[in-house]
């Protein structure tokens, strides 16, 4: 779909049934068609054709553990977990990702989240002992207490409050000049998606949702969020900002949002680029 956000549309077969099969993993590592994703820290390295860069196993660093990403047809694809922790990835990587094919952005996103999770979880959360990779890279096991740990995903609601044909966009202090986006926040323990949307809208902007409608979702690998996009009609357009979260908020109608999405030079604000779910959510609302 044209409105699908970045990091979706992956084409690898994740082949979960092979992750516990050590013999199959060994065969795949020995397959001449196997490739290892090139990363500089946590950032992708462009390949010769302008897509993701891949390395054959001949050039593979033997010190690195291999994380099984999946199958591209019959060809195994891996990411490398190196002994040294990577330097923090830069958000400037988003500029490169805009130039990659959509399915490759999805591959990179999954690899980045997985590699980053391993670097953050080298020790057991139960007993503190060192953990080791298992399940082809989709888990870590503690030999001391036998606890097993698996990659986590942090759910985030991102939503458009809607009233009288307009939607509410907010601006955080760290945003680039003129940038506004949909309001967002992490789900808390014991909360449903609908409850989180209502709470976040009221906390950040003082508006009360009368209903909540799910629209679409997006994995966001910085480091491991799942963005859950919703639209929520609200009782009133009166705004009461939480200035610890937002420095400004405003209502825009469909004509104004359409102008922003088209990049019209006269548009009074900017919104996140097509890679971000906020862009897809706004486009879905305009096209309703």
Which ranges hold each PLM region?
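N-terminal strand-loop-strand
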Residues: 140-182, 186, 208-209, 232
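Surface-exposed, charge/polar-rich loops and edge strands
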Residues: 191
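Hydrophobic alpha-helical positions that pack around
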Residues: 183, 197, 201
């Amino acid at each position: 779909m044209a409105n699908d956000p970045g990091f979706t549309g992956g084409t690898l077969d994740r082949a979960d049934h092979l992750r516990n099969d050590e013999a199959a993993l060994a065969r795949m590592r020995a397959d001449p068609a196997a490739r290892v994703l090139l990363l500089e820290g946590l950032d992708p390295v462009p390949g010769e054709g302008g897509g993701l860069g891949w390395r054959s196993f001949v050039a593979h660093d033997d010190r690195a553990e291999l994380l099984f990403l999946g199958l591209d047809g019959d060809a195994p694809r891996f990411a490398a977990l190196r002994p040294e922790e990577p330097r923090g990835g830069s958000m400037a990587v988003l500029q490169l990702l805009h130039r990659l094919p959509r399915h490759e952005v999805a591959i990179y996103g999954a690899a980045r989240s997985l590699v980053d999770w391993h670097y953050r979880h080298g020790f057991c959360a139960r007993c503190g002992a060192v953990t080791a990779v298992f399940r082809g890279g989709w888990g870590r096991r503690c030999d001391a207490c036998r606890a097993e740990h698996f990659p986590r995903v942090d759910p985030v609601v991102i939503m458009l409050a809607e009233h009288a044909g307009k939607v509410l966009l907010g601006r955080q202090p760290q945003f680039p000049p003129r940038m506004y986006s949909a309001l967002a926040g992490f789900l808390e323990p014991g909360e449903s998606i609908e409850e989180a949307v209502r709470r976040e809208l009221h906390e950040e902007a003082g508006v009360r949702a009368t209903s909540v409608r799910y629209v679409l979702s997006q994995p966001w690998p910085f480091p491991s969020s799942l963005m859950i996009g919703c639209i929520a009609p609200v009782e009133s357009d009166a705004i009461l900002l939480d200035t610890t979260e937002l420095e400004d908020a405003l209502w825009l109608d469909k004509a104004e949002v359409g102008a922003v999405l088209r990049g019209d030079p006269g548009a009074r604000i900017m919104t996140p680029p097509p890679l971000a779910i906020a862009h897809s959510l706004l486009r879905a609302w305009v096209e309703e």
